[in-house]
Amino acid sequence: MEAIIRTDKLEDLKAALSDNGLVHGMTVSQVLGYGEQKGFTEYVRGQRIETTLLSKLKIEIVSIDEKVDDIVNVIIKAVQTGEVGDGKIFIQPVERVIRIRTSEEDAQAL
């Protein structure tokens, strides 16, 4: 699954995910994007600056199917503010996982 979240919610999310033991790792990437939030306009030294792409974080987590709904609920509870710009969660299947170090596959590789 991928979750696009506000940058200031990362520590809350990390704490929530580690507290319940559902997730043993995740990948975090800085990304830019826009949706309903649309960006903002500010003035710097009298110059109008329009920011149309907002800084967000992309969280990538791979899990067994049985844990997906629980992980989604933890993510929502940890990062939801109720305001435009909270983000999105995308869930897609993963065909195969291989841990490079041990060659373990699928659930054992998670």
Question: Where do the language-model regions lie?
Answer:
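Positively charged, small/polar-rich N-terminal and surface patches that mediate targeting and assembly
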Residues: 1-110
